[in-house]
Structure formats: structure tokens, C-alpha cells
């Protein structure tokens, strides 16, 4: 249905109410509000749509409404010179088949509410679409280590170097400090002692050998506190055999 049809009906009802009458919209007895005779409209006079008769009746109609009569009555025949079918002489203020829309309204046009854009979404303040703002002091996908700790790094205990073992106090890794009066690789030979035998005081250095009579070359007599790689051999003991005395340990 065209958009102007409801408006046309509304105007028709308003005109009818102003003149104190109405228009009959029946199928068989519908009345036309006015009759045109020789191009001049006769107010309040209409014709019946009945096919058998066309008696004029007093009706109040709308100025400018066209008349279309199809009847067999000779007086209202389209050939009658006094009645012109579909001939409308409009008043100066009325245009045939023309509808003036209400002021401020455009046909088929929608005015959006002020401040609103069609199909547009305004993001809440402080929020970026498709974006996440991390909490303060936090970096995305990043972990801050505890104070004093480096990422993927291990801080050794005080006095300890990473991947390094510090020996007990007084002991150096793979190193032996000889006591005073003892020189490394010095040899004091007892009677009957094989060459390269070493007599050591307590705290004997590495690779020092004290040979007893009859001891095989490179045998070691370790006093308490003897360092690593020392061997204490009894008389008749072969090389690489260890006899423990007291708290002596073979390292």
C-alpha cells in the first residue's frame, strides 16, 4: 500500500467531519460527494453507484474529489454533456491527486535521535576496542623476578661461586699447602730409602712420599690430616694399597 493512502483517508475524514456529513463507502450504494455539471461543481449533490438508478442525493463532500460514474441511466451517462467523467476542476488551493506531507517530515526518511549514529558503537571511555590494558606495573607476557633475583639466574650462597665448589676452610681445591720447613718435591732420604721418597711433617703436601725400609717406590705414609691422593703403606705393602691410621682418609 502506498504511503500516501492513509494520509488521504485522514484528510477525507477531516473534511467530512467539518461539513457535518460523511461518505458512504458501501459497494452498492456508495455516494459521490459532489456532481460536476458543465465544468462547475454542484456542492452537496452526488450520484449513486447503483447500476439500476442514479438518483441525486444531498451529500457533503470534499472539494477537488474526482467523480467516476459508470451507470446505464441516460441522465448520468458518460455521454451526457452535463456530466464529465473523471473531469475535475480543482480549486485554487487544491491539486488533483497530490498530497502535501506534514511539515518537517520526509517520505521514506528516518531521522536518527540526536547524538546517535546508525550502526555505530561508541566504546566506553578509557577502553580501546579489541585491546587489553595491563594492570599498572605489569608488562604483558612478562614476569618480573623477585627483588634480588635475576631471571633464569641462580644466586649462590655467600662465599660460593656459581658452579664452583669452595673447599672447607684451610683446604684449597686440588691444592695442598705444605707446612713451614717443608718444600714441595723435596726428598729426605733415610738409610735404605729408595730415590724420590719424601719424609713429610703433619700436613704433608700432595704427591709426597715417606718410605719406610722395604717400602715400594711411591708409597705414602700419611699422618693425621693427610691430603687427597695420599697412601699409607705398611712394610711390604704394594702401591695403591691404603691402610687407615686414626682419622686418616684416602681422598
From Swiss-Prot:
It is found in: Secreted. Residues 150-164 have a biased composition (Polar residues). Residues 1-22 form the signal peptide. Residues 36-55, 65-251 are annotated as: Disordered. InterPro entries: EZH_Inhibitor. Keywords: Glycoprotein, Repeat, Secreted, Signal. Residues 153-251 are annotated as: 15 X 11 AA approximate repeats. It comes from the Eukaryota. Residues 72-87, 241-251 have a biased composition (Basic and acidic residues). Detected in the brain, lung, spleen, thymus and prostate. GO terms for cellular component: extracellular region. Glycans are attached at residue 120. This is Protein PBMUCL2. The gene is HCG22.
Amino acid at each position: 500500500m502506498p504511503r500516501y493512502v492513509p494520509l488521504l483517508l485522514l484528510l477525507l475524514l477531516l473534511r467530512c467531519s467539518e461539513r457535518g456529513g460523511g461518505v458512504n463507502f458501501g459497494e452498492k450504494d456508495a455516494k459521490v460527494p459532489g456532481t460536476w455539471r458543465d465544468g462547475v461543481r454542484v456542492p452537496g449533490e452526488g450520484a449513486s453507484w447503483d447500476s439500476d438508478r442514479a438518483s441525486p442525493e444531498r451529500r457533503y463532500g470534499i472539494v477537488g474529489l474526482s467523480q467516476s460514474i459508470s451507470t446505464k441511466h441516460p441522465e448520468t451517462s458518460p455521454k451526457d454533456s452535463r456530466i464529465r467523467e473523471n473531469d475535475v476542476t480543482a480549486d485554487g488551493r487544491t491539486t488533483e491527486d497530490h498530497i502535501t506531507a506534514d511539515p518537517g517530515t520526509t517520505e521514506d526518511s528516518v531521522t536518527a535521535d540526536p547524538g546517535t549514529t546508525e550502526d555505530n558503537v561508541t566504546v566506553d571511555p578509557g577502553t580501546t576496542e579489541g585491546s587489553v590494558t595491563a594492570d599498572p606495573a605489569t608488562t604483558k607476557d612478562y614476569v618480573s623476578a623477585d627483588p634480588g633475583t635475576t631471571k633464569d639466574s641462580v644466586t649462590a650462597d655467600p662465599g660460593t661461586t656459581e658452579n664452583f665448589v669452595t673447599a672447607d676452610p684451610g683446604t684449597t681445591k686440588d691444592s695442598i699447602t705444605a707446612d713451614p720447613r717443608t718444600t714441595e718435591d723435596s726428598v729426605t732420604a733415610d738409610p735404605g730409602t729408595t730415590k724420590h721418597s719424601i719424609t713429610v711433617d703433619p700436613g704433608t703436601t700432595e704427591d709426597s712420599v715417606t718410605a719406610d725400609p722395604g717400602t715400594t717406590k711411591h708409597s705414602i705414609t700419611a699422618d693425621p690430616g693427610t691430603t687427597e691422593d695420599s697412601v699409607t703403606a705398611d712394610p711390604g705393602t704394594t702401591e695403591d694399597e691404603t691402610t687407615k691410621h686414626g682419622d686418616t682418609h684416602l681422598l
